[in-house]
Amino acid sequence: MALDYVKVLNAQKKTFSVIGRGEASAAKFKEQTGIAPYVGGINKYLENNTLQPDTKFIIATGTEVLMPVLREVVAAGAGRVLIEKPAAVSIAELLENEQYLKNLADKIFVAYNRRFYSSVIEAQKMIKEDGGLQSMHFEFTEWAHIIGPLEKAPGVKENWFFANSTHVVDLAFYLAGSPTDWRSFSKHGTIDWHEKTNFAGAGITDTGVLFSYISNWESAGRWGIELLTAKRRIYLRPMEGLSVQVKGTVAVNEHEFDNQIDKDFKPGLYKQVEAFLTQPESLLNLSDHIDKSREIYQKML
């Protein structure tokens, strides 16, 4: 992710520094970007540098060290922080740090970049044109046969729903509103690295949108969101694309829209960074992320 952020920051003509840990990774980073990172990690950097009140940090470390780095950065007085999702290795770790971060939550933002996909912005425009969203269905199936063999830090795969699937869940309820009256179901599967593998649920959101979801990590499937208005069904599947089924027809056709920025950069990242630097209120702040984790993600599990 650090390489993707550098590409965006360079394109936006921003002045920035990069903090790395090891010599080998720093040398590789310099070879790829032409930028020499500060070596030694965040602790060493903060020991030798004083942060200005308007200093902005982007934390793009491995999932397992997101929270420790965040604690160091806010303790040192960072003015604003964008931290990669989901800001902690587990929901438990996030909630354990709630009190420590509570008074700082309005300046910490979680990088759910799919909110800024060109496809999502286009879908929002279409929903508004049609008079609003009526119902929604989403799926966050993960390919367990691919994820299982991956070598990850302890705790990452065990919390894969939180670390990865919440990309879909966050976006779904960002578009439809927060669930209010709803039920969720989940069950164990045969994989040994994640407690639950089969999920379903349904209900209504605070904006009156009916919703349902399903996910079976040991069957076929993929990420996707279906958005139903009075005039059409909008498909975000894949989520970078957009397809439409018009009311009274059975054909599902690709919808053309301007997504060049998501071809030039990692999808959603350019607009996300732009928002972080200029209009952070459009991002998910840490306080809301904590609430979602407690009230939605834990219930889905």
Segments from the language model and where they lie:
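Hydrophobic residues in well-ordered beta-strands that form the structural core
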Residues: L82-E84, I108-V110, L236
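C-terminal helix-rich "cap/oligomerization" subdomain common to oxidoreductases
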Residues: I19, E31-G34, N48, Q52-T61, ...
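Beta-loop-alpha module in the N-terminal Rossmann-like domain of NAD(P)-dependent dehydrogenases
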Residues: Y5, T33-Y100
